[in-house]
């Protein structure tokens, strides 16, 4: 196994969600030697349901998606910055659905309708934060990469 593909540095942050006023955990997993390799550009991959991404103890079903082992087992995958955005627990379906469900499976409880707000949170809060913390740039020259 190619040891250079091991991901060792994870940073945890709390970002305020504008439409709820609550803080949300966002984790950034950086490739090994990220801070030493300043000339290299890295793509950024965003995962929703962030509780499920890294740790089985945090996953709602007791098993994580095992992103780190998957990357380690596949050395041909380019090194990348992995961003995991936690969901809102009981409000998960509201955030991931742009429209309200016509009929709720639970009487007197509405589902959906916050998808636009969640997308705005990702685009206007999370992505700029990731850019600031990692040096990632979305300009036409850099595309999905770290600016030089």
Stretches found by the model and what they are:
Residues 1-148:
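Non-catalytic cap/lid and distal C-terminal segments of serine-dependent acyl enzymes
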């Amino acid at each position: 196994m190619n040891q250079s593909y091991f991901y060792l540095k994870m940073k945890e942050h709390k970002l305020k969600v504008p439409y709820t006023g609550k803080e949300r955990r966002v984790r950034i997993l950086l490739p090994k030697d990220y801070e030493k390799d300043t000339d290299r550009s890295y793509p950024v991959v965003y995962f929703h349901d962030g509780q499920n991404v890294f740790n089985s103890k945090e996953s709602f079903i007791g098993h994580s998606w095992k992103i780190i082992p998957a990357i380690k087992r596949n050395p041909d995958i380019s090194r990348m910055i992995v961003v995991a955005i936690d969901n809102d627990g009981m409000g998960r379906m509201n955030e991931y659905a742009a429209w309200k469900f016509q009929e709720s499976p639970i009487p007197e409880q509405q589902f959906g309708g916050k998808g636009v707000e969640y997308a705005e949170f990702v685009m206007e809060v999370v992505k700029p934060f990731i850019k600031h913390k990692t040096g990632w740039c979305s300009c036409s020259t850099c595309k999905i990469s770290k600016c030089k």
